[in-house]
């Protein structure tokens, strides 16, 4: 039936890792969606709790369509790749397992999507994230709709706050995360910035996604994560340094590159090759100072341009 084939057009994707006591909120919010035609794809990133029992019980309830995929522990970015490769539909909505959606979340996405659906300049739509009390994560904004690239929105206009990304699956298939063996943390900005160079997004100022975390302060684990996966961090910052962005943001990217480069086992000449000799001469000493401070306290609050997690 056309209704059945229509289900696959929209997919809510959730990577899970040992969050069995939290995923119930998200499940309940999916059950109460005003718009019913969607599939929930869950990729389990090698959980050690029995979250699969919970998901099987959801599947047995048979109230929404759920696809459950297991993978060896490889990090959220590999779970996203896996989800994208399994997704049959045209829209891919990334929702973390400890977050949940407003009742009309998918309905509003589908509403705004119709305006860019057949426009190849657009990679997708973005609604706003808010705290459980309804306040926006970041400053409130006054505009209703913005058509802009992610790089313009986030780095150049510097619009603070968190957005909920919904991408055309066909675009994401061309922008899978790189696979760097042995590293399990890659900020989503790697892919967001690459897409942002070539596509626009439709940003709509409606709260569609409820998150519980504090978005501002760089968490301790964020620094640790980048120290443990330095080659991903270096790739993000070297690409950021070459973007057409304000000078100060470029400088920050260069410093951050050399801040995490000492954690990488790459030969120095390869580190220099990735970002250029002048960057090495000018920014390596400053970056190295940050690295020494990171090593000392594993945490330093430099306002960081890029992904917050």
PLM segments and residue spans:
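Short, well-formed alpha-helical segments that are part of the catalytic scaffolds
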Residues: 18-32
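Conserved nucleotide-sugar donor-binding catalytic segment
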Residues: 135-220
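Catalytic core of nucleotide-sugar-dependent glycosyltransferases
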Residues: 209-211, 221-247
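Glycine-rich, basic loop-to-helix element that forms the pyrophosphate-binding segment
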Residues: 3, 71-87
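A conserved acidic beta->alpha catalytic loop
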Residues: 29, 44-53, 96
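Short aromatic/hydrophobic "clamp" motif used to bind/position activated sugar donors
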Residues: 92
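Conserved donor NDP-sugar-binding/catalytic core segment of glycosyltransferases
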Residues: 104-139
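Short, small-residue-biased leader/transition segments that mark boundaries at the very start
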Residues: 1-8
């Amino acid at each position: 039936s056309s209704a059945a084939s229509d289900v696959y057009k929209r997919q809510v994707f959730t990577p899970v890792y040992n969050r069995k006591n939290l995923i119930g909120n998200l499940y309940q919010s999916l059950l109460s969606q005003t718009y019913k035609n969607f599939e929930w794809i869950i990729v389990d990133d090698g959980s050690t709790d029995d979250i699969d029992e919970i998901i099987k019980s959801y599947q047995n309830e048979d109230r929404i369509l759920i696809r459950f995929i297991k993978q060896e522990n490889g990090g959220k970015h590999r779970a996203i790749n896996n989800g994208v490769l399994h997704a049959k539909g045209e829209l891919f909505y990334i929702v973390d397992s400890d977050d949940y959606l407003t009742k009309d979340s998918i309905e509003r996405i589908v509403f705004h999507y119709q305006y860019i659906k057949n426009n190849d300049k657009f990679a997708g739509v973005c609604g706003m994230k808010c705290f459980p009390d309804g306040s926006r994560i970041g400053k409130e904004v006054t505009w209703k709709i913005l058509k802009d690239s992610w790089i313009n929105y986030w780095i150049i206009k510097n619009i603070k706050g968190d957005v909920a990304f919904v991408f055309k699956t066909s675009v994401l298939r061309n922008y899978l995360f790189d696979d760097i063996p042995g590293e399990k943390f890659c900020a989503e900005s790697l892919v967001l910035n690459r897409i942002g160079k070539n596509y626009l997004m439709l940003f709509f100022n409606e709260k569609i996604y409820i998150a519980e975390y504090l978005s501002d302060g760089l968490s301790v684990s964020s620094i640790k994560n980048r120290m443990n996966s330095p080659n991903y961090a270096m790739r993000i910052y070297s690409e950021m340094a070459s973007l057409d962005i304000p000078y100060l943001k470029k400088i920050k990217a260069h410093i951050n590159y050399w801040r995490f480069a000492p954690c990488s086992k790459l030969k120095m000449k390869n580190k220099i090759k990735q970002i250029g000799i002048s960057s090495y001469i000018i920014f390596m000493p400053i970056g190295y100072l940050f690295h020494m401070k990171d090593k000392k306290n594993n945490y330093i609050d430099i306002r960081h341009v890029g992904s917050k997690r």
